[in-house]
Amino acid sequence: GNSSIILTERGTCFGYRDLVVDPRSFTVMKSFGHPVLFDAGHSIRKYGIPSSDPNGGTKQFLPTLMMASAAADLNGLFIEVHPDPKNALCDAASQLSFDEAGRLITKYFKIAKFVRELKNS
């Protein structure tokens, strides 16, 4: 078999079109010994709503989920960025502007660095 595997948490559909991320899955996935990524942009999408629909995501949860994944010391992060998110042709409701992405990524890496320093102390 292929040993070059990357696991990705993207949320699981429960209830009313919500994709739910259980942070415990980060630890479970890491236990398999493969790199783990978090698809933050997908995890806030509203399941079953077209990606062009502005009601198709819950962007207000993106910062919290991104920071949780940084604290979990994952190997990578997916986010979707667009110069004009509301006019993006796909996943408009979950896109970050360049400015939003820059601010959140800066915070993300500060948390990730702190967590790694704690692990190594």
Model-predicted regions and their roles:
Residues 1-81:
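Catalytic alpha/beta core domains of metabolic enzymes, predominantly
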